[in-house]
Amino acid sequence: MKSKNKILAVTAFAMLSLMGCNIDPILTDSYSEDVAWSNVDNLRLNLNGFYSLIGGYYGSEVENDACTDILKMNGPRDSENLFVFGSAPITPAANPFNNWDNRHTWQLSCCRFLHNLAEHRGNFPESIANEAEAEARFFRALVNFDLAKRFGASFILHKELPVMGEKNHARCTPEECWDFIYEDLTFAAKYLPKRWDDATKDPWGEATHTGRVTQGAAWGMLARAMLYAQRWKDASDAALEVKKLGYALYKNPSRPDKGYGELFMNRRSSRVDNNESIIE
């Protein structure tokens, strides 16, 4: 009898074990690729991750101007002043302007997004897919432009997501660099909206779009990049497109003589309808 009970117990345990093997648990601490690319809301959350690049631009990138006569830092121990006066020398091992690793990481993130978007493009309306691609290509051009400014437009340029384990990827030529930046930004200018509609419910949802890159941002970035490339006609044409979009110096209709000064008195948290602002 005891032997029979043992056999039944072992059999029951084995059956439960086999049944347990068929259970596919739902992970609650991460999302699969299919979930991340399943709908428009998740697509937008994916894109939001790139916007820290704009916040970073208005931090260290602007502060770099303090190494010239464009901007002044007040503190004698501000790093920019230490560099200028030689108290903190720049060396190959310690270079605060070095963005090689950071920008190449972002470059690959943009390529990975575009690769996955191409694989899941059928999940979205074509207009939304084009807008998403345009946003990602804007940011890819932005990080490549950052690399071009630092490394003479000769760096490791990935036009597509590289194969895992790929080594010895040759640096691009300056012509390849500027052509690729031009292609990305002209695509972005074509498919980004002139202005995001904050009240839209379809297809992006009800959340505000203030601060998202626009057609003007793409043309403006292209004009600046082409100046660095010394492609004067391309720079002039892009700047003209910005002008056509109606950007203008800020003025307060009720106090036209105080408009410019008021910009420096507004809180960052308060929204100002400012036609002078191209990239926020």
Sequence positions of predicted segments:
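Membrane-proximal, proline-rich intrinsically disordered regions
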Residues: 21-66
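Short, surface-exposed recognition loops and adjoining beta-strand edges that mediate ligand/DNA contacts
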Residues: 60-75, 157, 194-221, 228-280
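Bacterial N-terminal signal peptides
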Residues: 10-17
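Conserved, well-structured interaction surfaces
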Residues: 39-56, 78-151, 166-179, 185-195
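Bacterial N-terminal signal peptides that target proteins for export
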Residues: 2-9
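Short linear capping/connector segments at secondary-structure termini
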Residues: 29-33, 88-89, 158-166, 200-207
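Bacterial Sec-type N-terminal signal peptides, specifically the leucine/valine-rich hydrophobic h-region
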Residues: 18-20, 144
